[in-house]
Amino acid sequence: MVKLGCSFSGKPGKETGDQDGAAMDSVPLISPLDVSQLQPSFPDQVVIKTQTEYQLTSADQPKKFADLEGQRLACSHPEEGRRLPTARMIAFAMALLGCVLIMYKAIWYDQFTCPDGFLLRHKICTPLTLEMYYTEMDPERHRSILAAIGAYPLSRKHGTEMPAIWGNSYRAGKEEHKGTTPAAMTVSTAAAAAAAEGNEPSGKPLDMREKEDPQKAEDVPSQSPK
Protein backbone atom coordinates (compact mmCIF):
# COMPACT_ATOMS: atom_id res chain seq x y z
CA MET A 1 0.00 0.00 0.00
CA VAL A 2 0.98 3.57 -0.50
CA LYS A 3 0.92 5.71 2.51
CA LEU A 4 -0.51 9.08 1.88
CA GLY A 5 1.66 12.05 2.82
CA CYS A 6 4.99 10.17 2.66
CA SER A 7 7.99 11.59 0.91
CA PHE A 8 10.23 9.61 -1.43
CA SER A 9 13.28 11.88 -0.98
CA GLY A 10 15.13 9.30 1.14
CA LYS A 11 16.18 11.85 3.74
CA PRO A 12 13.82 11.89 6.64
CA GLY A 13 15.81 14.54 8.56
CA LYS A 14 15.70 17.11 5.81
CA GLU A 15 12.64 19.30 6.00
CA THR A 16 13.59 21.71 3.24
CA GLY A 17 11.92 21.50 -0.17
CA ASP A 18 9.83 23.42 -2.54
CA GLN A 19 6.12 23.77 -2.03
CA ASP A 20 5.49 22.41 -5.48
CA GLY A 21 7.43 19.24 -4.76
CA ALA A 22 5.50 18.77 -1.51
CA ALA A 23 2.22 19.24 -3.35
CA MET A 24 3.15 16.59 -5.94
CA ASP A 25 4.11 14.12 -3.25
CA SER A 26 0.83 14.56 -1.46
CA VAL A 27 -1.39 13.66 -4.56
CA PRO A 28 -2.63 10.06 -4.35
CA LEU A 29 -1.70 7.71 -7.17
CA ILE A 30 -5.23 6.15 -7.60
CA SER A 31 -8.34 8.26 -7.48
CA PRO A 32 -11.89 6.76 -7.46
CA LEU A 33 -13.86 6.96 -10.78
CA ASP A 34 -17.52 7.75 -11.22
CA VAL A 35 -19.59 5.24 -13.23
CA SER A 36 -21.61 7.96 -14.90
CA GLN A 37 -18.47 9.21 -16.57
CA LEU A 38 -17.79 5.81 -18.27
CA GLN A 39 -21.36 5.28 -19.83
CA PRO A 40 -22.52 8.10 -22.07
CA SER A 41 -26.18 9.06 -22.04
CA PHE A 42 -28.33 8.17 -25.10
CA PRO A 43 -31.19 10.36 -26.35
CA ASP A 44 -34.77 9.10 -26.06
CA GLN A 45 -35.62 9.61 -29.78
CA VAL A 46 -33.50 9.24 -32.86
CA VAL A 47 -34.47 10.85 -36.17
CA ILE A 48 -33.05 9.38 -39.38
CA LYS A 49 -33.43 11.25 -42.62
CA THR A 50 -33.14 9.41 -45.97
CA GLN A 51 -33.47 10.49 -49.57
CA THR A 52 -34.54 8.29 -52.53
CA GLU A 53 -34.45 9.21 -56.19
CA TYR A 54 -36.66 7.33 -58.71
CA GLN A 55 -38.39 8.00 -62.02
CA LEU A 56 -41.58 6.45 -63.51
CA THR A 57 -42.05 6.30 -67.27
CA SER A 58 -45.45 6.82 -68.87
CA ALA A 59 -45.58 3.19 -70.14
CA ASP A 60 -44.79 1.54 -66.81
CA GLN A 61 -47.10 3.69 -64.76
CA PRO A 62 -50.49 2.29 -66.06
CA LYS A 63 -49.20 -1.29 -65.79
CA LYS A 64 -48.32 -0.82 -62.16
CA PHE A 65 -51.66 0.80 -61.50
CA ALA A 66 -53.44 -2.12 -63.22
CA ASP A 67 -51.56 -4.64 -61.09
CA LEU A 68 -52.47 -2.74 -57.99
CA GLU A 69 -56.12 -2.67 -59.06
CA GLY A 70 -56.11 -6.45 -59.67
CA GLN A 71 -54.54 -7.10 -56.30
CA ARG A 72 -57.08 -4.88 -54.64
CA LEU A 73 -59.98 -6.71 -56.30
CA ALA A 74 -58.50 -10.11 -55.42
CA CYS A 75 -58.03 -9.13 -51.83
CA SER A 76 -61.49 -7.59 -51.57
CA HIS A 77 -63.26 -10.94 -52.40
CA PRO A 78 -61.25 -13.79 -50.86
CA GLU A 79 -64.31 -16.09 -50.64
CA GLU A 80 -64.81 -16.11 -54.42
CA GLY A 81 -61.24 -17.29 -54.91
CA ARG A 82 -61.88 -20.18 -52.54
CA ARG A 83 -65.18 -21.20 -54.19
CA LEU A 84 -63.65 -21.55 -57.67
CA PRO A 85 -61.50 -24.68 -56.97
CA THR A 86 -64.40 -26.28 -55.10
CA ALA A 87 -66.74 -25.81 -58.06
CA ARG A 88 -64.18 -27.32 -60.41
CA MET A 89 -63.75 -30.36 -58.19
CA ILE A 90 -67.53 -30.88 -58.00
CA ALA A 91 -67.88 -30.64 -61.79
CA PHE A 92 -65.05 -33.12 -62.32
CA ALA A 93 -66.60 -35.56 -59.83
CA MET A 94 -70.00 -35.32 -61.57
CA ALA A 95 -68.44 -35.96 -64.99
CA LEU A 96 -66.54 -38.98 -63.66
CA LEU A 97 -69.71 -40.38 -62.08
CA GLY A 98 -71.60 -39.96 -65.37
CA CYS A 99 -68.90 -41.86 -67.28
CA VAL A 100 -69.03 -44.68 -64.74
CA LEU A 101 -72.82 -44.94 -65.04
CA ILE A 102 -72.65 -45.01 -68.85
CA MET A 103 -70.03 -47.76 -68.80
CA TYR A 104 -72.08 -49.78 -66.31
CA LYS A 105 -75.21 -49.48 -68.45
CA ALA A 106 -73.39 -50.38 -71.65
CA ILE A 107 -71.41 -53.32 -70.27
CA TRP A 108 -73.46 -54.83 -67.46
CA TYR A 109 -77.06 -53.60 -67.49
CA ASP A 110 -77.83 -54.06 -71.20
CA GLN A 111 -75.84 -57.27 -71.65
CA PHE A 112 -76.80 -59.27 -68.58
CA THR A 113 -80.40 -58.26 -67.89
CA CYS A 114 -83.53 -58.83 -69.95
CA PRO A 115 -87.10 -57.55 -69.48
CA ASP A 116 -90.00 -59.73 -68.43
CA GLY A 117 -90.85 -62.47 -70.92
CA PHE A 118 -87.31 -62.71 -72.30
CA LEU A 119 -84.45 -65.07 -71.53
CA LEU A 120 -80.72 -64.35 -71.76
CA ARG A 121 -79.02 -66.78 -74.13
CA HIS A 122 -75.54 -66.20 -75.57
CA LYS A 123 -75.70 -62.56 -74.37
CA ILE A 124 -78.86 -62.01 -76.42
CA CYS A 125 -82.37 -61.52 -75.03
CA THR A 126 -84.70 -64.00 -76.72
CA PRO A 127 -88.44 -64.47 -76.09
CA LEU A 128 -89.40 -67.42 -73.92
CA THR A 129 -91.80 -68.75 -76.58
CA LEU A 130 -89.05 -68.99 -79.19
CA GLU A 131 -86.70 -70.49 -76.62
CA MET A 132 -89.21 -73.23 -75.86
CA TYR A 133 -89.81 -73.85 -79.57
CA TYR A 134 -86.16 -73.92 -80.64
CA THR A 135 -84.57 -75.72 -77.70
CA GLU A 136 -83.08 -78.45 -79.88
CA MET A 137 -81.74 -76.16 -82.58
CA ASP A 138 -78.15 -75.13 -83.19
CA PRO A 139 -77.23 -71.82 -81.47
CA GLU A 140 -75.96 -70.36 -84.73
CA ARG A 141 -79.22 -71.15 -86.46
CA HIS A 142 -81.16 -69.98 -83.45
CA ARG A 143 -79.66 -66.52 -83.77
CA SER A 144 -80.63 -66.07 -87.40
CA ILE A 145 -83.90 -64.51 -88.37
CA LEU A 146 -84.58 -67.21 -90.95
CA ALA A 147 -84.69 -69.90 -88.28
CA ALA A 148 -88.45 -69.56 -87.96
CA ILE A 149 -88.92 -69.91 -91.71
CA GLY A 150 -86.56 -72.88 -91.93
CA ALA A 151 -88.20 -74.66 -89.00
CA TYR A 152 -91.72 -74.17 -90.31
CA PRO A 153 -93.20 -77.62 -91.17
CA LEU A 154 -93.33 -78.16 -94.90
CA SER A 155 -96.22 -80.66 -94.66
CA ARG A 156 -98.66 -77.83 -94.01
CA LYS A 157 -99.86 -76.37 -97.28
CA HIS A 158 -102.47 -73.71 -97.42
CA GLY A 159 -104.95 -73.61 -100.28
CA THR A 160 -106.44 -76.32 -102.49
CA GLU A 161 -104.53 -78.24 -105.09
CA MET A 162 -105.65 -78.37 -108.72
CA PRO A 163 -107.34 -81.59 -109.85
CA ALA A 164 -105.16 -84.04 -111.70
CA ILE A 165 -107.23 -83.77 -114.91
CA TRP A 166 -107.06 -80.02 -115.11
CA GLY A 167 -103.42 -80.08 -114.04
CA ASN A 168 -102.48 -82.52 -116.81
CA SER A 169 -104.40 -80.54 -119.40
CA TYR A 170 -102.78 -77.30 -118.26
CA ARG A 171 -99.29 -78.83 -118.44
CA ALA A 172 -99.99 -80.37 -121.83
CA GLY A 173 -101.28 -77.08 -123.16
CA LYS A 174 -98.24 -75.27 -121.81
CA GLU A 175 -95.84 -77.77 -123.39
CA GLU A 176 -97.58 -77.79 -126.75
CA HIS A 177 -97.93 -74.03 -126.80
CA LYS A 178 -94.25 -73.89 -127.65
CA GLY A 179 -94.92 -75.54 -131.04
CA THR A 180 -95.39 -73.54 -134.26
CA THR A 181 -98.09 -75.56 -136.14
CA PRO A 182 -101.81 -74.92 -135.52
CA ALA A 183 -102.45 -78.68 -135.85
CA ALA A 184 -100.56 -79.23 -132.65
CA MET A 185 -102.84 -76.70 -130.98
CA THR A 186 -105.94 -78.56 -132.13
CA VAL A 187 -104.54 -81.87 -130.94
CA SER A 188 -103.86 -80.41 -127.50
CA THR A 189 -107.39 -79.03 -127.21
CA ALA A 190 -108.85 -82.36 -128.32
CA ALA A 191 -106.72 -84.20 -125.80
CA ALA A 192 -107.88 -81.84 -123.06
CA ALA A 193 -111.53 -82.38 -124.02
CA ALA A 194 -111.10 -86.15 -124.07
CA ALA A 195 -109.43 -86.09 -120.69
CA ALA A 196 -112.32 -84.05 -119.33
CA GLU A 197 -114.86 -86.63 -120.57
CA GLY A 198 -112.85 -89.48 -119.07
CA ASN A 199 -111.77 -91.04 -122.36
CA GLU A 200 -108.19 -91.57 -123.42
CA PRO A 201 -106.98 -89.28 -126.19
CA SER A 202 -106.37 -90.95 -129.53
CA GLY A 203 -103.34 -88.88 -130.28
CA LYS A 204 -104.36 -88.40 -133.95
CA PRO A 205 -105.16 -85.16 -135.74
CA LEU A 206 -108.74 -84.04 -136.02
CA ASP A 207 -108.85 -84.40 -139.84
CA MET A 208 -107.75 -88.01 -139.70
CA ARG A 209 -110.40 -88.78 -137.09
CA GLU A 210 -113.09 -87.21 -139.26
CA LYS A 211 -111.99 -89.38 -142.19
CA GLU A 212 -112.12 -92.50 -140.08
CA ASP A 213 -115.60 -91.78 -138.65
CA PRO A 214 -117.48 -92.19 -141.99
CA GLN A 215 -115.74 -95.47 -142.68
CA LYS A 216 -116.81 -96.80 -139.28
CA ALA A 217 -120.35 -95.65 -139.93
CA GLU A 218 -120.43 -97.57 -143.28
CA ASP A 219 -119.00 -100.71 -141.71
CA VAL A 220 -121.60 -100.82 -138.98
CA PRO A 221 -124.76 -101.08 -141.22
CA SER A 222 -123.05 -103.55 -143.51
CA GLN A 223 -122.40 -105.84 -140.62
CA SER A 224 -125.91 -105.55 -139.11
CA PRO A 225 -127.88 -107.62 -141.71
CA LYS A 226 -125.54 -110.49 -141.28
From Swiss-Prot:
- Keyword Protein transport annotated: no
Q: Where is the composition biased (Basic and acidic residues)?
A: 206-219
Q: Which GO terms describe its cellular component?
A: axon; axon cytoplasm; cytoplasmic vesicle; cytoplasmic vesicle membrane; endosome; glutamatergic synapse; membrane; plasma membrane
Disulfide cysteine pairs (residue numbers): none
**What InterPro entries does this protein map onto?**
NSG (IPR009431)
Question: What PANTHER family does UniProt report for this protein, alphabetically?
Answer: NEURON-SPECIFIC VESICULAR PROTEIN CALCYON (PTHR28546:SF1), NEURONAL VESICLE TRAFFICKING-ASSOCIATED PROTEIN 2-RELATED (PTHR28546)
Task performed by this protein: Interacts with clathrin light chain A and stimulates clathrin self-assembly and clathrin-mediated endocytosis.
This protein's name: Neuron-specific vesicular protein calcyon
Originating species:
Rattus norvegicus
Upper taxonomic lineage: Eukaryota, Metazoa, Chordata, Craniata, Vertebrata
**Name of the gene:** Caly
